Structures are given as structure tokens and as C-alpha cells.
Amino acid sequence: MDTNKRLNLTMLCDFYELTMSNGYFACGMQDRITYFDIFFRTVPDNGGFAIAAGLEQAVEYIQQLHFDDEDIAYLRGRNMFSEEFLQYLRNFRFTGDVWAVPEGTPIFPREPIMTVRAPAIQAQLVETYLLLTLNHQSLIATKANRVVRAAEGRTVLEFGSRRAQGGDGAVLGARAAYIGGCKGTACTVSDELFGVPAGGTMAHSWVQMFDSEYEAFKTYCEIYPDNPTLLVDTYNTLKQGVPDAIRTFNEVLKPRGLTKCGIRLDSGDMTYLTKKARKMLDDAGWQSCRISVSNSLDEHIIRDLLMQGAKIDMFGVGERLITAKSEPVFGGVYKLTAVEDEAGNIIPKIKISENVGKITNPHFKKLYRFFGNDTGKAIADYLCVYDETVDDSHDLEIFDPEATWKRKTVYNFTARELMVPIFRGGKLVYKLPTLAEIQSYCAAQVDTLWDEVKRFDNPHTYYVDLSQKLWSIKDELLRENSR
């Protein structure tokens, strides 16, 4: 293999996407219009909601879809694909339509976060990568948002590159963490590529390279006098590290009139050490010195530290964020929901399972979110058939699609359609926002959720309801396929 060849993401697909596509071609079904939804079934960490992320990379992937000569040669060498199909792939481009929720949107189980309408082969071949990028980044953005909410307004930085599961895991993970609310990253290339603010302090190796900790601190502050952060736990945090930091601040920063500085702890009892360090710094007149901590943090440890009164201004969160260690899989799936017949009529499709939670919602659909006009808070999400509209000037009865006797009348509300057009006829029609805009949007949308939905433990179930028309179509399909 030519290692200088740029990775062609078109071939980043499960092999059965290609065998099915060859089969569609052999059956003359390659141009049949299909509809697929991406959705997930459970929120990671038993949370109340997830955060959508990864759309920008999905857009770039779709724009670049093509098979080159090396790809065709490889497929021909497998002796499984017809020559006519391989010639078809030579001219392959995406010509379909895509709708998706914007990145940073809070999302809930069993509602579509992306819908693809395209000829059968096109829709089939994009499955793997779309799931890959949306699953990964939504997972990390969701975890980051949990961590950021646990920090209660304190700065959170993503520190996980060296523990990430591969290069893309680090680079795109930092991007997703920023969407979820982290203020920056230690991953330099994520700043270069996406504008995620990169920063860092020093490692223990810097301190060990000098004859004394004081000399290491003094040298560092002389090189970087603007807001330096010193790692104080290389030897003895309270007896040596903090006193050496105070001495350095007094000798290097104070004469220059500089007050912004910080210390970082990466080991030990963070509650005890930060309380003691805070008092030492304050007594020395360095109330402006920020205390940062790292070391295998997650939302639960951060919450416990703050409940115990730890004096912490900033958290550096690494492995448990970048790998979403507590639940490292986001279970997004890609399911066929409808096809078009020769006359252009949309025929709903359903996937049935003995596991009720795996039964799909059929048809080409719209997704609405209802907001209370008096509170601005999200009330429920509402799935309906593509040709339905919601008139929010009138009361609307909604019901639990599984326990249909549970009903509620929604009034004084605003209905907002969540899915927006991304591609039409293979052309990008969506203006991609900046990463900072996505982060701000995410924070604003999370604020529309009730605190009960945002609980870490046993959150309130946020309802995703079906319109009566959609529920009836689903019920009819279930009855037809159970006879």
C-alpha cells in the first residue's frame, strides 16, 4: 500500500455495504429512493439527554465521496463485484438530501438526529462513516457537558490526548469536548484545525530537569511571565511546591506588576491540598492565584470535591473524558424508514424486534421541540409524518407512544422544527457555524432543559411523542407484520 496516499474515507465502510450495493445494482434497484434515520436508544451514563456533534465532519465526508482507481482495483481483486457495478462506482457521487439537528442540540432517545434521502446505493454506502463520526463526537460532547455542569461554572479543559484511542480520537474528541462546554484543550492540532483554544503548563519532567524546584519555577516564569501556572506536586506539595511557587511569584511577577498566575496539582488528596494551598497563597497576598487540578477526574469526582469544599478554580480532565470511560459507546444506529415507489409515493418501512425498544419509528418524519412560552423551557419533542404541521396557536394533546393512556395537553407553547436541511440534490445548502457559535448554541439549548432532566442520577424522563397519524401508521405496520 502507498502510505503517502491520502486516506479515502469513501472506503471506510463495512464490507457488507458494498456487497449489498452490488446486489442492489444487480437487481436494478440502485436508483430507488430510500430514507434512513440515524438515532440512538439510550443516553450514556443513564443521563437525561445527549449532545449532538460531528455534523461538520459528516458534511466534509459527503462532499468528498468518490472511488479512485486504487479502490476500484482493490474491489475488482476481491472477485465479488460485477464489472458493471465497478464502472458505476467510478462515477459515484452523492446526489441525495440530508436533514440533521444542528451540532450542540440536546437530543433524546429514538428521535432522528439525521435523515438521509438518497438512491439506495448512495444511502447504503454512507452508513458506516456517518455513524462513526456522529457516535464518537456525540459521546464525547455529552460526557464533556456532564463534566462542565459538575464544575458549576469553573473552567474545564480537555487534557486527554495521550490517553485517547487513536489520533482522530484525540483531535476530534477535543473538538467535541469544546462543543460540550470545555474552554480549551491540550491538543495543539485541534487548535490549528478547529480553533479549540490550546494551552498548557508544564510536566513534572520540567521540574526534574533543574537542580531545584525553585530554579525550575523561576526559569519558567522568566520565560513565560504572563499568567504562568506552576506544577507544585513533583516533590512535596505543601512543604516545598507551594512555598517555591509563592517565592517565585514574589521575585519574578510582583516586581513587574503582574498578578495573574496559577498552580496545578496532579496527585494527592485534592480537597485537603487545595484548602491548604489556598490559605497559603491568600496569606502570602496571592489571592489572584488560580488553583488547577488534574488526575483521572470525571463529573462524579468533581462534584464530590466541590461538595467537600475543595478550593479549585480549574479542572483538567483527561482520560475519563476523551474515552468516555464510564460508558465508551454511543449506540447510534442507521435504519431504513421509507422507500419511494415508481410514482414517487413514500412507502413507510418498519423494523420489528422482540425487544420493544428496538422497534423503529417508520416513515419520513419531522421532529419538533415544544417550548413553554411562559418559561422558555422545553416541554417535549414531537415526531410526525413529513406532511404534517404543528399549529402552536392552538392547544395540542400529546401522548406517550407506548403507554398511550398517558396524555397531556400542551398550551401556550412554541413549536420549533429541529431538523434543518443540510444537502439538497447533493449540494450543500447549510452554512456551517463556527465552533465557538456551536458551543454558545449548545449552552443556550441546555439551559432550556429543566433541572430535573439534567440530574446525573435518576433524571426525569423527557418525552419524545408521536403524532396520532404517525402512531397509527406504526401500529398498522406492526399488525400487518405480526399476522
Go through each PLM region and give its residues.
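Short coil/turn segments at secondary-structure boundaries
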Residues: A73-Y74, T142-R146, G160, K454-T461
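Short, positively charged
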Residues: R78-L86, G166, H394-E402
